[in-house]
Amino acid sequence: LFIDPFLLFNSTDSEYQKIHHEMIDYLLFLQKQSEKHPKLPSEMRKAWYSFSEVKQTWLGFSLSGNAGRGMGSDFAVGLHAGLNSIFKDFGSQTVTKGRHMEKICLISPRVGRDKISDFTANFAKKYLLEYTQSFAKQYLSADQCQEFSVAKAYFNWNTKTWASQKYYLPSFNSDYVLLTPKAMLTRDDTF
């Protein structure tokens, strides 16, 4: 299963649409950075272009367990270069209706549904944390949950950094678990 950005874009749920808008806004932010810095500095790559797999969703491909590879430095470099070249008009193009981050599949032959799902999960993370916390408080007992400080819970636009936040979540093997609504998920390769 994968988190499908098209399902977020086409959803009637305003929260899902908000996640898609945040992804587009972030890509536009990265595009501006790529114009200012044609060569990607390593500290910028680490701070803004590196996205690990949100393993607590237990989605995607992995030989064992839930720890996939995420989106490595090849993706970061390719995205940076793409936003300053083939996607220079990202957000202002007129060929398709709306802005679609799924076009980043074109930057590398290794970017497919698993990596797009990883990217999307990073932006859906705050929603998933709040969704799971609400479920945990309502339906789970205290011995099934604990408070976790979650790194990169959301992007703080004021400081231009990924921020941590504490959440009360289900616990499994000393880590938290994230629930993902079925309406966000697909098995199909739609992007």
Question: Could you say what each language-model-derived stretch is?
Answer:
Residues 1-191:
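Nuclease-adjacent, charged terminal/linker segments that flank catalytic cores
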